[in-house]
């Protein structure tokens, strides 16, 4: 079997990777690292790693031990920061190069994806059970609530003053609860997606226009698109709902006027590996970035789970629905958040050419 050239292997590595010389200066960086660090190879090459990245680990000591012992070294639970980006927890692996032991290979494994994949397999059945129970309760509770609202309306006919205000309050609150229960039922009854080749920019345009004349009228929505993106395979209506939900979250989180940036780009190296060992390339990237207050730290790790919300009157179903739809599209969604910047990234497959 003929092996591909080293350059192709290097460029195809799914993990961020860098090569450092004897002075710990960057001599090579692969495309996955450029994307993850949001820094170009031109900007990094020749630079001391510690000058461009903030890493909560003694890098000089780590690299010195690797060169001295001629063996790989693993460092877990490291916080890595570049520029204004929020810290990302990573695992690092440093190893010497066989033909040049003074050169060190550094692999970066972001913890977020690995942790979420592990959690997903454990909580999936529990979440499904919770949703099933919620659907059943919603159906059973709606009927008596309708009776309560009807009785309150009948009572109000012979009342006035403070007593009338109380019956009106009963009617308003029962309607609010019924609306919430209908959202729970809707979440559990999302139809399977009708998969067809979809231009993701058409989807984003529909969502942007709807937001601009409604809940997002006070926001500045900036488009930063790669016009060369190929179609994805998906359900245009459901994907529109995904981006409407993300735009709505960003708009509601903003204090007064804010800015939302819609960005698309192609990452040929991104591949999602599932717990069963399989995998799929997800090269189409869509980012929704806002300058709002960020996601509260105590719910950041569970923001895509049902009934988790950072807003006082939120149902906690919007992002759970987004995650569910993207999962059914064989895609992936992730989030980075800090005060002043929240980034949701959706990764999707390319539509087969024969369709």
UniProtKB/Swiss-Prot annotation:
Domain Histidine kinase spans what residues? 136-352
The record describes the protein's role as:
Member of the two-component regulatory system NtrB/NtrC, which controls expression of the nitrogen-regulated (ntr) genes in response to nitrogen limitation. Under conditions of nitrogen limitation, NtrB autophosphorylates and transfers the phosphoryl group to NtrC. In the presence of nitrogen, acts as a phosphatase that dephosphorylates and inactivates NtrC.
What is the native source organism of this protein? Rhodobacter capsulatus (strain ATCC BAA-309 / NBRC 16581 / SB1003)
Tell me the superkingdom of the source.
Bacteria
State the UniProt keywords alphabetically.
Answer: ATP-binding, Cytoplasm, Hydrolase, Kinase, Nitrogen fixation, Nucleotide-binding, Phosphoprotein, Transferase, Two-component regulatory system
GO MF terms here are:
ATP binding; hydrolase activity; phosphorelay sensor kinase activity
Summarize the PTM comment.
Autophosphorylated.
Pfam families the record matches: HATPase_c, HisKA
Q: Does the keyword Nucleus apply?
A: no
The record's section on SUPFAM superfamilies has:
ATPase domain of HSP90 chaperone/DNA topoisomerase II/histidine kinase, Homodimeric domain of signal transducing histidine kinase, PYP-like sensor domain (PAS domain)
| Catalytic activity, EC | 2.7.13.3, 3.1.3.-
Protein's UniProt name: Sensory histidine kinase/phosphatase NtrB
Biological process terms from the Gene Ontology for this record are: nitrogen fixation
Task: Name all PAS domain ranges.
Answer: 4-71
One Gene Ontology cellular component annotation held by this UniProt entry: cytoplasm
- List locations, semicolon-separated: Cytoplasm
PANTHER family attached to this UniProt entry = PEROXIDE STRESS-ACTIVATED HISTIDINE KINASE MAK3, SENSOR HISTIDINE KINASE
Catalytic activity field: ATP + protein L-histidine = ADP + protein N-phospho-L-histidine
Checking SMART domains in the record gives: HATPase_c, HisKA, PAS
Q: Which residues carry this modification: Phosphohistidine?
A: 139
